[in-house]
Amino acid sequence: LLENLPADSLPVVQTDLQHHARGCYTAHSEVKRLNRQCEHSLVQAERWSTIGTVLQHLPDGGESIRQAWETVLFNQFHDILAGTSIEAAYQDVRNAYGSVLLTTDKIRNRVIQEIAKRIDTTGEGRSIVVFNPLPWRITSPVRVPSSIKRFLGRFLGVVDDSGKEIPSQDIVGQQVGNRDLLFLADVPGLGYRTYRGIPLTGTARKQEGKQMLHVESGLLENDYWRIRVDGQSGEVVS
């Protein structure tokens, strides 16, 4: 067949032949983020539901989880997840993903509340119970809302379940004028650990941490970056 075709009738192609899906791998990053968020939330909901059923004899959330998985899988159809659907379709997709996250939040919160009600929280200060839905031990920052600080006093320290003081830090709160508390929690896999926020009376114990950012005229520097800024234009020069 090719031998019978005139040579000048064959076009010269100098670009990608697979042009119909151009850009769809980056289009609608929101739907890709929501898809992954729902996947992780559903896996965690399965764990919490199992824990609640086995340990607390709570109603099984299997049917709700199954329906939520069907919603996620439907939205993994290639036109939707790839980003090639029309914008109106993604309004429905956002609502669908929202219903999935609502389902997983309800299951998680129900089980956590049931477990928390059975934890001994007597003692000084206010208990801070940190849960870990992953099957391995993690060390992760925990943010304590300013409402606990208002209840206990201005200065707080954090101790673990053995009474050992945990380094903590005041940070800017999510509400205007408030300061939250930040500390690192070490929590076993598929478990919880109880910390306590205790008021610091008298002279508050305060230690200056390592200076993370060095600032001088036209220079910002930390362990990884040294950025010089033009004092007139504000542009980064190096």
Which residue ranges define each predicted feature?
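Glycine-centered coil/turn sites that cap beta-strands in beta-rich domains
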Residues: 140-148
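Catalytic-domain carbohydrate-binding cleft regions of carbohydrate-active enzymes
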Residues: 1-133, 140, 152-171, 177-193, ...
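Beta-strand-rich N-terminal accessory domains
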Residues: 133-137, 198-238
